[in-house]
Amino acid sequence: MRNHWPWMMVGTLMIGVGVAEAQQNPGDSAQTVGKGKVLDLVFRVEDMGGKVQSLEIKESATEVRIDLAADVLFDFDKADILPKAQSTLKQAADVVREKAKGTVRLEGHTDAIGSDAHNQKLSEQRAEAVKSWFIEKEGLRNMSFASKGYGASRPVAPNKKPDGSDDPDGRQKNRRVEIVISK
């Protein structure tokens, strides 16, 4: 159904034009073209599942790695999947369906704020949340998943600037869930 939504929007727009034309009041702005009127319609269409984030996919000879930014998936310091994450997770699930031949690893990572124990637990919960979402929402029950949390032990960017001050951009990059698909 996902590929048909643009046509559904065109159909809805055509119906809306007919209704708008039938309900047009005298003095409303419209152009007459031939026998019909052309109304200026302005509207905004949004994906109800949230903004679709582009996936960062790295592919090598041995694996495919998808990086999902935690700020797209979760609120800060939480492990509950946000509604806005659905489109991004659906994209990732499509890649998993296409590429996975064996066990798919889900690796959770955090920034360095908080204790090591807290970050370890949070990273495990986040990896498990993505695994559960794939199984429950995308129906990937027949695939093998392994989830693991790494806490703040595998940063991809510095958590602090060279002068020792906080680096919010670096910390944001470190908060992520990686999907690793072995070839």
Where do the protein language model's features map onto the residues?
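Periplasmic peptidoglycan-binding/anchoring modules of Gram-negative envelope and division proteins
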Residues: 45-59, 74-107, 179-183
